[in-house]
Curated annotation (Swiss-Prot):
Cytoplasmic compartment spans: 1-17, 79-135, 185-243, 289-580
A Pfam family annotated for this UniProt entry: ABC_tran
Residues spanning the membrane: 18-38, 58-78, 136-156, 164-184, 244-263, 269-288
Class of enzymatic activity (EC top level): translocase
Membrane topology: Multi-pass membrane protein
Functional note: May be involved in multidrug export. Transmembrane domains (TMD) form a pore in the cell membrane and the ATP-binding domain (NBD) is responsible for energy generation.
InterPro entries found in the cross-reference section: AAA+_ATPase, ABC1_TM_dom, ABC1_TM_sf, ABC_transporter-like_ATP-bd, ABC_transporter-like_CS, P-loop_NTPase, Type_1_exporter
Name of this chain's protein: Putative multidrug export ATP-binding/permease protein YgaD
GO CC list: plasma membrane
Keywords linked to the UniProt accession: ATP-binding, Cell membrane, Membrane, Nucleotide-binding, Translocase, Transmembrane, Transmembrane helix, Transport
The family this protein is said to belong to: Belongs to the ABC transporter superfamily.
Source organism (scientific name): Bacillus subtilis (strain 168)
Amino acid sequence: MGVMKRYMQFVKPYKKQIFVTVLIGIVKFSIPLALPLLLKYVVDDIIQGGGTASDKTTSLFTIMAIMFALFLILRPPVEYYRQYFAQWTASKVLYDIRAKLFDHIQKLSLRFYANTRTGEVISRVINDVEQTKDFVITGLMNIWLDMLTILIVISIMLTLDVKLTLISIVLFPLYGISVKYFYGRLRKLTRERSQALAQVQGHLHERIQGMPVIRSFAIEDHEQAQFNEKNGHFLDKAIRHTNWNAKTFAVVNTITDLAPLIVIACAGYFVINGPLTVGTMVAFVGYIDRMYNPVRRLINSSTTLTQSIASMDRVFEFIDEPYELTDKPNAIKADQIRGGVEFQNVSFQYEKDKENILHDVSLKVNRGETVALVGMSGGGKSTLVSLIPRFYDVTSGRLLIDGTDIRDYEARSLRNQVGMVLQDTFLFSETIRENIAIGKPDATLEEIIEAAKAANAHEFIMSFPEGYETRVGERGVKLSGGQKQRISIARVFLKNPPLLILDEATSALDLESEHYIQEAMDKLAKDRTTFVVAHRLSTITHADKIVVMENGTIIEIGTHDELMDYESQYKHLFTIQNLN
């Protein structure tokens, strides 16, 4: 019941629309309830009543004309508005939930995404949220209408014959027993099926992104076997769910089909041996159908609601994923950052109870300085710079910006003061203009063009027929590595932050692209505090400080000339690269 109560918080803003939908539904379901009474009247009062054949025919066509008019005038608009309001309300609720989830997604730590498959996150936001739609339409609307229909039908039947009415509802307790027995396990099976589907989606999403690797290594058969294993696991869970669901329907529908047989037998006996009229018997059989159809729908609704609640469990399990990084209640805005950065005895680990990646790192960087971080792969360079925009909090020690611990700043305002150009540039499948504007969403086209020119990107952008409106494809697949990198640099020019991080931004590029990008980065770094993670040491000889890292610690600090004056690790690396 806890998840249903939480779900109702999303439904609450639309309670008026739900109330109107239920009222319209009452009218919709009430209209057909007149048909058995009409049938009784036709049988008892017209067909078996007194009068000539002509009088009976006139009475029959008169009453039928009235009923035709009633159905033609009322039924279409009632049916339309009930369906429209029900679907509109459910869609709005799902819109709000997905908006909440996306807001939540943007606040989760990078550690969460490192440990969670993208496809599984997508499954929660799309599939599981969609499954909860039935709770709104079925649980909050149809169930009440079906229950009200049953009560109205029983009330009408009681006016016709009390004894036969009691016989009609004698099987009701069996429904309650069936629901209690079947639906507890059904919720568990539904949850397992949803989890298996999320695994398939996660696997599929990853393989689609890695299709060039699959093709280049010719491992299609291996990957097909891997997918078949995941898909087979989902199939197994789906069949187990279907098997249990089928048992539920078998029992429920058998009970539903027995009820009319019992009523027909008893009603026939009462007509033969008692005062019950043929018309009343016919009406009763008609009402049995109108009573047990809602009962059947209620049981089916239990299945639907069980599946919806299982999906709610997964949705709220995701919403309850804690934030690793939260702002202090009195956090200050980082609007006036000057650019001084200091690491004070900083240690860091990605996972608790795991070995530290950084060990007691201390480093002071003055405003406007360019600091290069060099060393062998795995030394902790990228980890160190990832602490500056507070993607992670330090495990111990302090990281200060302008003398203030970064945990005292609002994280979002702090990140707004940091520009990053990474080796693996991510572009969205939108236009070049929109991708550059990520640096400043409200930027004018003129500002975007100026940023592109500064990044040496304007010329190649204008070589495309659609210029800045060229769509770059998923992850920028239509652009070369150098072109994507220049778009990334243009973003930072547009953002114009006081702090800059360049993480291996020129690695794996051809010489021409590297020349354009290095020139753009030199312009970008001017008058900014800049951290450069580099493997090509020839690109950072101008740095104010060169920091050599090894196994998560700083082993050397100095300028290029200072470090080349003795047998330093830096000199060793620089000499090897120049020899190559």
